[in-house]
Amino acid sequence: MGDDQMSAREIRYRELASIEASLNYVAASPERLKTYTFDPPAGTPRSNAVFEPHRVRIFDVRAAAPELDREGFALVKKATSVQDFSDEDAIRNVYYPEAEALLLDHTGAERVVIFDHTVRRRLAGAIDRTSGVPRQPALRVHNDYTEKSGPQRVRTLLGAEAESLLQKRFAIINVWRPLQGPVRDAPLAVCDAGSANPDDFVASDLIYRDRVGETYAVKYNPNHRWFYAPDMTEDEVWFLKCYDSNRDGTARFAPHTAFDDPAAPLNIPPRESIELRALVFYGQ
């Protein structure tokens, strides 16, 4: 993107409504970052990552008209027919096909494979990934996949056909929807991929009982441009680009995080949301 075009976008962003809030970025560490998804052996910390709050400006996305391949995210209005998101069968048999059709239509891709989902229900003081506790909003800046783990996810899920698929463009896109609106508690903030530098991303091990995944923690950069959707409703979804194999200037990684909105009133309903993760194959 040319400097003139970028400058025009910067001016337009500064004209948008915005708030200031604290986002948690990873602190510098000489060690390889590791986080366990289960209770680790005695004496081993659940995570060795340290996060530091930084005040940032977060713009109202609704007037920004972001594009998935430019900023790395998009806000789309689309209702769902699913009424009960505690029903796993409804999620897999109804919601998955709805989201697949929505992604195909929005991206123009040839094939979409939705491979998992997470329902989050915030509980005050709860720690994420604790046994018996619903998954909690992730209050730290991160990206779900890395240069290494993106292709590896395709190999793990699709086996023998993976290598031929990896010869063409593919992406990993999250589909994020609130289950109750308007969202005032722990809304999602997303970062313009074009405002992040490669050095901002820190590869981190995510340790499961049967495998080790890799995600990106993110270091603070004052140039990051953040966006959120005020009072997001259950009829809206975020598309978040977590990986893209294209290296032609297309948005590849869009950091994101939940955050505490300082303007939110007291005693608001706790956030409930669902996110799907999808492999998106473009056939080119």
Language model regions located:
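Non-heme Fe(II) oxygenase catalytic core, chiefly the N-lobe of the double-stranded beta-helix
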Residues: 9-216, 220-230
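Catalytic core of Fe(II)/2-oxoglutarate
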Residues: 216-284
